[in-house]
Amino acid sequence: MRSNMIKKGIDRAPHRSLLRAAGVKEEDMDKPFIGVCNSYIDIIPGHMHLNKFAEVAKEAIIEAGGIPFEFNTIGVDDGIAMGHIGMRYSLPSREIICDAAETVINAHWFDGVFYIPNCDKITPGMLMAAVRTNVPAVFVSGGPMEAGRTKEGKSLSLVSVFEGVGAFSSGKMTREELLEIEQLACPTCGSCSGMFTANSMNSLMEMLGLALPGNGTLVATSTERHNLIKDAAKHLINLIEKDIRPRDIVTEETIDDAFALDMAMGGSTNTVLHTLAIANEAEIDYDLTRINEVAERVPYLCKISPASDYSMDDVHKAGGVAAIMKELIEMGAVKGDRITITGKSLYENVAHAQITNTDVIRTKETAYSPVGGLSILYGNLAPDGAVIKVGAVDPSIKTFTGEAIVFNSQEEAQEQINNGAVKEGQVVVIRYEGPKGGPGMPEMLAPTSAIQGRGLGTKVALITDGRFSGASRGISIGHISPEAAEGGPIAFVENGDMIKIDLIERTIEWEISEEELAKRREGWTEPEPKVKKGYLARYSKLVTSANTGGVMKI
């Protein structure tokens, strides 16, 4: 066992003395030491209940024959951090979470790790740590929030509140109506109830083979999640005994299949960023162009908020992620013979699943679209790629051409959108918000929600080198690479330039001559860093572009 490094031999007597002080008994020294990597945090609704999950996990690990040691990571609530300096810390927190987990796991030579994530950057941060350390691991997330309901029974989520702000500012909603939505949208603990980033990643974990069926859709308040925890603990001990590690499970083919599920469910654009980062930690050289290849063979089967009024709970009641996975395997879009944490194949894990509501989960024959819900766009404005959640764009929109209205920060854009400066037919360009330029690649939920709330969702496009919340919808193109801070083409766009977006051909083109572009390049100088000390200053110097997952390189 790995843990023998700290508990066996005469020279480890001091180590054992400290372990005894921590409650380890003599008879425990021959048992596997299990790290319980938790992320309990009071201020994050998706994590406020995870202390209870950890207690269930520790009891289950002891019962299964292991010795648990709980430790915690940091976390950022993206909704609370949205629209101000706090959002610049969101994506960078992913790297801290990964590094922190690696530090505790390797410093103490755990034999296995039981990860308990839930929200946006915590889940990918822990997944990155799992494949980086390559110690036997299982995941059980905190689960999605129950959907809110108006007094009339209409489904609500956090995006309802963000879009309500835009509706109020444009006179389409009263203060009292907005207050009602604010009070009803988020009724329980758990990750936000739609197919936003947290639930996208927690669903993808089922396809990755690192979490059990039900992980992505069982609501946080369900006692069935405790059964997932107990089962996962037993599987973890088995993984340790058989020496099955995360990199045995997560392969290049696994990454393809994760994107296949993403396409079928119209997941958050952030999944592209995070899954590429996970591949990087697993030492898989994954080409961004493969994502469009996956999209071509995977139909769009399941529209969830913000693309519809369905919540994750609705998906669970309709058969869950397992039913979608089974459909994808049986149509040949996903390989069903891959190994998973259960010791069984992917198909064996989901063979029991059935689609019970074809309004929520469609079949191949009745799919919303024959191609997946995410696209990578290329063109002279994004030579290294950009991402759009086509599943959250009005189906009638195939192309969009408009004049650029350019902003050098999200705050500037937000102010002008609220003031009515953005008009129908324009392409809002928000730049210097990439991984380096932000720094931290902040999400643009406030601007996209303001556009939707003002009734411009099908009449205005928004492009950025920043990123979007999973709750964003409309013609919202993010991750434009190279970013403006690196001298990417988006740095040279000016007001009035024509930009054409083609969702069928997956292109984003900017009307400019080579001569004019060269002239604009000559007058450009790299901007001063917005942050000159602290973690964000270090992050901006080390982080890579979005097309490689926004990972840090030494």
Curated annotation (Swiss-Prot):
Amino acids binding Mg(2+): 78, 120-121, 443
Catalysis: reaction(s): (2R)-2,3-dihydroxy-3-methylbutanoate = 3-methyl-2-oxobutanoate + H2O; (2R,3R)-2,3-dihydroxy-3-methylpentanoate = (S)-3-methyl-2-oxopentanoate + H2O
Taxonomic path: Bacteria, Bacillati, Bacillota, Bacilli, Bacillales
Entry GO MF terms: 2 iron, 2 sulfur cluster binding; dihydroxy-acid dehydratase activity; magnesium ion binding
Pathway: Amino-acid biosynthesis; L-isoleucine biosynthesis; L-isoleucine from 2-oxobutanoate: step 3/4; Amino-acid biosynthesis; L-valine biosynthesis; L-valine from pyruvate: step 3/4
Matches recorded under InterPro entries: Dihydro-acid_dehy_C (IPR042096), DihydroxyA_deHydtase (IPR004404), DiOHA_6PGluconate_deHydtase_CS (IPR020558), ILV_EDD_C (IPR056740), ILV_EDD_N (IPR000581), IlvD/EDD_N (IPR037237)
Function: Functions in the biosynthesis of branched-chain amino acids. Catalyzes the dehydration of (2R,3R)-2,3-dihydroxy-3-methylpentanoate (2,3-dihydroxy-3-methylvalerate) into 2-oxo-3-methylpentanoate (2-oxo-3-methylvalerate) and of (2R)-2,3-dihydroxy-3-methylbutanoate (2,3-dihydroxyisovalerate) into 2-oxo-3-methylbutanoate (2-oxoisovalerate), the penultimate precursor to L-isoleucine and L-valine, respectively.
Cofactor(s) the protein needs: [2Fe-2S] cluster; Mg(2+)
Cofactor stoichiometry and binding remark: Binds 1 [2Fe-2S] cluster per subunit. This cluster acts as a Lewis acid cofactor.
Residues binding [2Fe-2S] cluster, per UniProt: 119, 192
Gene3D superfamilies given in the database record: IlvD/EDD C-terminal domain-like
Pfam families: ILV_EDD_C, ILVD_EDD_N
Lineage: superkingdom: Bacteria
Gene: ilvD
Any single Gene Ontology cellular-component annotation: cytosol
Keywords attached to this entry: 2Fe-2S, Amino-acid biosynthesis, Branched-chain amino acid biosynthesis, Iron, Iron-sulfur, Lyase, Magnesium, Metal-binding
GO biological process: isoleucine biosynthetic process; L-valine biosynthetic process
Record's subunit section: Homodimer.
Active site per the UniProt annotation: 469 (proton acceptor)
Family named by the database record: Belongs to the IlvD/Edd family.
Positions bearing N6-carboxylysine: 121
Name the record gives this protein: Dihydroxy-acid dehydratase
EC number: 4.2.1.9
